[in-house]
Amino acid sequence: MAKKSHQENNDNLIAQNKKARHDYFVTDTVEAGLVLTGTEIKSVRAHRVNLKDGFAQVRNGEAWLMNVHISEYDNGTYFNQDPLRNRKLLLHKKEINKLVGALQDKGVTLIPLKMYIKHGYAKVLLGLAKGKHQYDKREAIKRREQNREIERVMKHY
């Protein structure tokens, strides 16, 4: 039996950054683990995550996920962490070096696309992205509407 990839199985999908592909050209993706505390992983499993304004950076040879909101766990006490704290990403050194090289280009950033649970561990799918201009967004919307119109016409035949 073929092994399912993380993109085929959406049962464990926690959060998805839907605006990312609208606002950016995503050229490459990489999967990274997250260092979370106990109450944070409970909030993640409860789907209380917002990736919208998040981004990742490489500092001192370590990758960090920033500005991702993981809500406080309802039943947590003083163990709850700051919802917007920086979280360390677990990547191999080769992957970090590859990202550092790619991030040297002007206008390239690292954004979270999806967060999911894989084999009991929280993972985040990061995308190497370059920002779109307004005319690129309009062109994509126009192309999408044309495809819908073609599908609608073809459906009747």
From Swiss-Prot:
GO terms for cellular component: cytosol. Transmembrane segments: none annotated. CDD domains: SmpB. One of its GO terms (biological process) is trans-translation. It is found in: Cytoplasm. Gene3D superfamilies: 2.40.280.10. Its main location: cytoplasm. GO terms for molecular function: RNA binding. The keyword Glycoprotein does not apply. Belongs to the SmpB family. Required for rescue of stalled ribosomes mediated by trans-translation. Binds to transfer-messenger RNA (tmRNA), required for stable association of tmRNA with ribosomes. tmRNA and SmpB together mimic tRNA shape, replacing the anticodon stem-loop with SmpB. tmRNA is encoded by the ssrA gene; the 2 termini fold to resemble tRNA(Ala) and it encodes a 'tag peptide', a short internal open reading frame. During trans-translation Ala-aminoacylated tmRNA acts like a tRNA, entering the A-site of stalled ribosomes, displacing the stalled mRNA. This is SsrA-binding protein.
